[in-house]
Amino acid sequence: MRRRRTLTRQTEGSALVEFAIALPLLVVFLVGIYDFSGAFNQKQKIGHAAQEAAVIAGAQPMTDMDPAAPATANPYSLQPVLEVVFSSLSADNVLPQGTWASCAVAHNHLSELKWSFTITGCTPDSLVIAIDRGWVTSVGGPPTTVGTQVTVSYPYHWRFNSVIQLLVPGAIYAATTNISETATVHNQM
């Protein structure tokens, strides 16, 4: 009994024990701050690319777009939009420094004036760009305006998953989150 009281009153080594407990928490907080700021930064860059693409798409002519065209139709006027997104994300270091020429672009004609493009081969993940040239908005009735809506989606790979294992071994945390941003503009042509 006396020995137990003596052990609980001793303070030698308590700083080392506190440090051993606090260090994993500190590492998790630091990596969490770094990782969440990286995700937010990537979201801003994707939003910027979507806005640039919407401006370019809204200024493109619609003469090569036929709502009655077959599902295999791929309007040439949308190609600059894809290149703008790729160039913007490459310049912002969201995409690896690949070249547009090495990309494989699969398109899907969703409806009359809506297309979805999946870019693979030049990035480790799939970059998805959805373009709606017939986006209609009405605020409380007529008059309505017709614009272009561009949605850009690209995954973010979290680093937090490997660090959370320090505190909770076996914890499952999503390793990838798909970040998507949408931008709209009024059609100029």
Where are these regions (language model features)?
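Transmembrane beta-barrel outer-membrane domains
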Residues: 20, 143-145, 174
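Alpha-helical assembly-interface signal, strongest on the long, hydrophobic N-terminal helix that forms
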Residues: 2-91
